[in-house]
């Protein structure tokens, strides 16, 4: 093409320079000025890597002064182009714009514009873009979005609760599973779903101070959710940036004490427009009608301002009716306003629970029972269902299940309360206690005597705690460097035990970090035992490394030495040997220690080793836990109640272990109390609520469906392809592990989700669970989600040129592979992607206007193609530009029919699903007052907005690839 001064060209290799202008021409060279950057470039006149910029009718172009022109006519004179059209700001027609006046910062966003401007991508990027579109569309349609990306075992009851609650608008529920059943994971899954679906954007978690780090770790490790921990110092820092410090972060964890202490903070929190509030240990919020506690009032004030509320609490039976009512009152004060009324109402639900037990028992129903069921369900046309349930036919079981579902819907608090018990959930291991009584060394005897004399002024509480840890008493008198481990028989026993069990992973827990560190040194120096240490002084990354070292089968540590606080929130169910080097002060901490191994998914019996020193507080506490509470070999739901009521008597025995008069009787009384409370709990079990909470077959199906998705080979190949193209370094390790690190040539300088020092990932859920340092990669992992966004929100792969070597076709045959996207723009919370995700429609057009896509599958076609360098691609495009325009016009006519069909299907599906959901809730409102008006209103509004937005759905060209046939 002849060059003329003033022509506009773009660089094929440096498109970031913008639009260039020809400013000098000589015999062999031309000079382009790029006004956007002020740079000049010298190019050879022949075969230079630049492309002439020419726009077509219907394009919109920008003048260097900023106004835009809709092109209607293109004229050319002396090698220079003039565009004629309508000015968009003034609507003036017949306006002429010479090409020299085009805006130099011009960027090409439409695929065809980029193609004609020579901004042509590599072929593999086009393929990645199409796959990204295809897989993203498929993932949006799956019903369990937000559930499968978690780094946790697929446990049916947890998945069921999370699915049920996570799908709701502003859920307000009580999660009251027994200890060890995973309330934190359920809450995390609900948060994850709400965030992914756009139902929530700002989340506040309020927990006791001791659990802050546990929640921080759980949210990050299991759900890849980065919360900010707000304490006094963080609050002061944020105050410098904003009048309301809580507006500076989207997801915040803080302690209840942090909020309670300062009225201004509470008001700022309440004003910070949160979408979801999560409160752990909610059973500690004391309430009475006359005098609610300050803590209760704090949460009440927050719950009034925040639409969604999750309360995590002990089981209702443990709390008592009044305390249980107080939690429900936080969720819905209009519904639960009168305690007496609540008690009467609860009694009315007893027959419903009995009816469910009857139906599930499979026994024949008497006429009285049939009448009772008819009255309870109170539906027209219920007779055939009752008849089928009482028959011997094949339909009997299905009819009974349907009746149970109807009863569940009418159950008083089943929509706001979820509670599973260990009796209702199978899969827990047995626990076996081994008590190892050891002699009390004379050094400790002396230290304890002296401590008794010198510590006489200490409180009973402080003396009791001292007596449990004699090594600390000894160090108080002998100095911090006193070598207590040289004579403490527990150390000798531990060494021998570990040597005898070299093949076993052993978790050792002690109260203090210092004890753990000293034990590690002894194990290493005396028996060369490999041990990892885990305590509160370590950073999150250091704890991950220690846990990974312990988890590794090949060259890992045999022992993990944990302090009390350091072990919070970590689970090691691949080990089954637990050594308690000392004992914690209360039953909750004891259960927490055992809970590190006693989880669903533990496949072996848990061996609990308790070496203790005779004639000490340790010996008394072992007896009280085992004989009084049965807390070692079984979970102890009564522990906190009995601990609180017998606290004074217990600490007086612990503070003076030599005075044991009445101890046997005290332990016997505690055991009787324990058995009595346990019986009450068992009798008070609400089997209907348990059925509703564990989800039955629905939970099983969810777990199975997600497990099948876990082995998705498409994810692995797509992810590796994505890492290659983004420029992320990959290093294979053993055991299905890959180490990802940033490179110097990535598509973006900082890839979101990839730490600067890299991370270890695996596509295997079990592997991720056994390796603390390995992240579990699924379609929901931030690296994959951010990778999809990076590719699809930008121009990567939006145009390409390839060669097809095929002697069956004439040389020069031209094909245009077009990828259109059918989509609707709408606020994220409407979740339009359930019905119409951005859906790719692929077309393969020939010169005759025929679409060959149905006959030529993408992957097999892609494998036959060869890449072309950018410069050659530009020349090819210029040669066939007019033909491509014709093909695009032909494709537009064809894609409209396909797009409209997709949109109509989405509208029908949305209307059916949302109308059914709405009708069900409205019908249930008549028989179950726990269905909130605002929930129905939100669903009604949601349905209206979804259908409106689907009506406005459209389609656009997302990517184009020209394919030219060659025989070489």
UniProtKB/Swiss-Prot annotation:
GO MF annotation terms: ATP binding; DNA binding; helicase activity; hydrolase activity, acting on acid anhydrides
Q: Where is this motif: DEAH box?
A: 280-283
Q: What is its EC number?
A: 3.6.4.-
Query: What are the UniProt keywords, alphabetically?
Result: Activator, ATP-binding, DNA-binding, Helicase, Hydrolase, Nucleotide-binding, Transcription, Transcription regulation
Q: Name one Pfam family in it.
A: Tudor_RapA
Question: Domain Helicase ATP-binding spans what residues?
Answer: 164-334
Tell me the ranges covered by the Helicase C-terminal domain, including all copies: 490-644
- Tell me which residues bind ATP: 177-184
Which of the seven top EC classes does this enzyme belong to?
hydrolase
One GO term (biological process): regulation of DNA-templated transcription
Please give the family membership noted in the entry.
Belongs to the SNF2/RAD54 helicase family. RapA subfamily.
PANTHER family from the UniProt entry: DNA ANNEALING HELICASE AND ENDONUCLEASE ZRANB3 FAMILY MEMBER (PTHR45766), SWI_SNF-RELATED MATRIX-ASSOCIATED ACTIN-DEPENDENT REGULATOR OF CHROMATIN SUBFAMILY A-LIKE PROTEIN 1 (PTHR45766:SF6)
Briefly state the protein's biological role. Transcription regulator that activates transcription by stimulating RNA polymerase (RNAP) recycling in case of stress conditions such as supercoiled DNA or high salt concentrations. Probably acts by releasing the RNAP, when it is trapped or immobilized on tightly supercoiled DNA. Does not activate transcription on linear DNA. Probably not involved in DNA repair.
Q: How does it assemble?
A: Interacts with the RNAP. Has a higher affinity for the core RNAP than for the holoenzyme. Its ATPase activity is stimulated by binding to RNAP.
In Swiss-Prot or TrEMBL terms, this protein is called RNA polymerase-associated protein RapA
**Can you name the source organism?**
Yersinia pseudotuberculosis serotype O:1b (strain IP 31758)
Q: Which gene encodes it?
A: rapA
């Amino acid at each position: 093409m002849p060059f003329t001064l003033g022509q506009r060209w773009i660089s094929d290799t440096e498109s970031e320079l913008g639009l260039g202008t020809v400013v000098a021409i000589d015999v062999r060279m031309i000079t382009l000025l790029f006004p956007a950057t002020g740079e000049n470039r010298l190019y050879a006149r022949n075969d230079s890597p630049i492309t002439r910029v020419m726009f077509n009718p219907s394009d919109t172009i920008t003048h260097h002064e900023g106004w835009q022109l809709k092109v209607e006519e293109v004229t050319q004179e002396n090698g220079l182009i003039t565009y004629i059209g309508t000015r968009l700001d003034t609507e003036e027609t017949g306006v002429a714009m010479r090409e020299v006046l085009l805006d130099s910062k011009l960027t090409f966003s439409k695929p065809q514009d980029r193609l004609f401007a020579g901004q042509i991508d590599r072929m593999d990027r086009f393929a990645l873009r199409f796959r990204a579109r295809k897989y993203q569309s498929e993932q949006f349609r799956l019903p369990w979005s937000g559930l499968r990306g978690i780094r946790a075992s697929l446990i049916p009851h947890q998945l069921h609760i999370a699915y049920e609650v996570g799908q709701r608008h502003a859920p307000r529920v009580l999660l009251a599973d027994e200890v060890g059943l995973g309330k934190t994971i359920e809450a995390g899954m609900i948060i994850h779903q709400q965030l992914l679906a756009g139902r929530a954007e700002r989340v506040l978690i309020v927990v006791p101070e001791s659990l802050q780090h546990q929640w921080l770790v759980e949210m990050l490790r299991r759900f890849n959710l980065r919360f900010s921990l707000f304490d006094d110092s963080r609050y002061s820092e944020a105050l410098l940036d904003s009048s309301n410090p809580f507006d500076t972060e989207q997801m915040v964890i803080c302690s209840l004490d942090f909020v309670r202490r300062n009225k201004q903070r509470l008001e700022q929190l309440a004003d910070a427009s949160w979408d979801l509030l999560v409160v752990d240990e909610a059973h500690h919020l004391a309430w009475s009608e006359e005098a609610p506690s300050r803590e209760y009032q704090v949460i009440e004030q927050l719950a009034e301002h925040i639409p969604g509320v999750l309360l995590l609490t002990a089981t209702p039976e443990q709390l008592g009716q009044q305390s249980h009512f107080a939690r429900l009152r936080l969720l819905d004060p209009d519904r639960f306003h009168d305690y007496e009324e609540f008690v009467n109402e609860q009694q009315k639900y007893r027959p419903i629970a009995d009816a469910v037990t009857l139906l599930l028992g499979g026994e024949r129903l008497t006429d009285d029972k049939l009448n009772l069921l008819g009255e309870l369900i109170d539906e027209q046309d219920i007779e055939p269902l009752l008849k089928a349930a009482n028959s011997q036919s094949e339909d009997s079981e299905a009819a009974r299940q349907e009746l149970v579902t109807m009863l569940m819907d009418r159950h008083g608090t089943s929509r706001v309360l979820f509670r599973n018990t260990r009796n209702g959930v199978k899969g827990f291991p047995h626990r076996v206690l081994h008590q190892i009584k050891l002699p009390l060394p004379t050094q400790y005897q002396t230290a304890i005597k002296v401590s008794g004399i010198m510590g006489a002024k200490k409180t009973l509480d402080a003396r009791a705690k001292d007596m449990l840890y004699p090594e600390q008493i000894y160090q108080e008198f002998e100095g911090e460097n006193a070598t207590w481990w040289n004579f403490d028989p527990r150390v000798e026993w531990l060494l021998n035990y570990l040597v005898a069990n070299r093949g076993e992973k052993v978790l050792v827990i002690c109260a203090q970090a210092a004890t753990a560190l000293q034990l590690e040194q002894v194990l290493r120096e005396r028996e060369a035992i490999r041990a990892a240490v885990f305590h509160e002084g370590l950073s999150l990354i250091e704890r991950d490394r220690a846990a990974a070292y312990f988890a590794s089968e090949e060259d890992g540590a045999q022992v993990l030495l944990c302090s009390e606080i350091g072990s919070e929130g970590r689970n090691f169910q691949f080990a089954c040997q637990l050594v308690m080097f000392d004992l914690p002060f209360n039953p909750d901490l004891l259960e927490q220690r055992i809970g590190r191994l006693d989880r669903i998914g533990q496949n072996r019996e848990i061996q609990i080793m308790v070496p203790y020193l005779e004639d000490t507080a340790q010996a008394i506490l072992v007896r009280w836990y085992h004989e009084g509470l049965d807390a070692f070999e079984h979970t102890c739901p009564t522990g906190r109640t009995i601990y609180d009521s017998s606290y004074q008597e217990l600490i007086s025995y612990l503070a003076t272990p030599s005075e044991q008069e009445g101890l046997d009787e005290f332990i016997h009384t505690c055991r009787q109390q324990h058995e009595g409370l346990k019986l009450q709990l068992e009798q008070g079990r609400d089997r209907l609520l348990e059925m509703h909470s564990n989800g039955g077959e629905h939970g099983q199906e969810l777990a199975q469906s997600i497990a099948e998705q876990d082995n998705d080979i498409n994810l692995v190949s797509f992810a590796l392809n994505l890492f290659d193209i983004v420029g992320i370094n990959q290093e294979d390790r053993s055991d299905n592990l890959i180490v990802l690190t940033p490179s110097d040539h990535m598509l973006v300088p900082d890839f979101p989700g990839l730490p600067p020092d890299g991370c270890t990932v695996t596509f295997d859920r079990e592997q991720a669970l056994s390796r603390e340092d390995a992240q579990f990669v699924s379609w929901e992992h931030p690296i994959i989600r951010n990778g999809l966004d990076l590719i699809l929100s930008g121009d990567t792969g939006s145009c390409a040129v390839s060669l097809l070597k095929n002697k069956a076709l004439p040389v020069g045959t031209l094909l245009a592979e077009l990828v259109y996207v059918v989509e609707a723009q709408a606020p994220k919370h409407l979740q339009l992607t359930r019905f119409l995700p951005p859906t790719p429609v692929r077309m393969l057009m020939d010169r005759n206007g025929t679409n060959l896509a149905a006959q030529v599958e993408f992957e097999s076609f892609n494998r036959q193609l060869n890449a072309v360098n950018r410069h050659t691609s530009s020349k090819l495009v210029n040669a066939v530009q007019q033909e491509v325009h014709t093909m695009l016009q032909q494709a537009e006519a064809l894609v409209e029919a396909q797009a409209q069909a997709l949109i109509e299907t989405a509208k029908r599906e949305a209307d059916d699903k949302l109308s059914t959901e709405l009708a069900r809730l409205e019908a249930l409102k008549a028989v179950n007052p726990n269905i909130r008006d605002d929930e129905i209103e939100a669903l009604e509004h949601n349905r209206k907005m979804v259908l409106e937005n689907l009506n406005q759905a459209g389609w656009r060209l997302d990517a184009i690839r020209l394919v030219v046939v060659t025989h070489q």
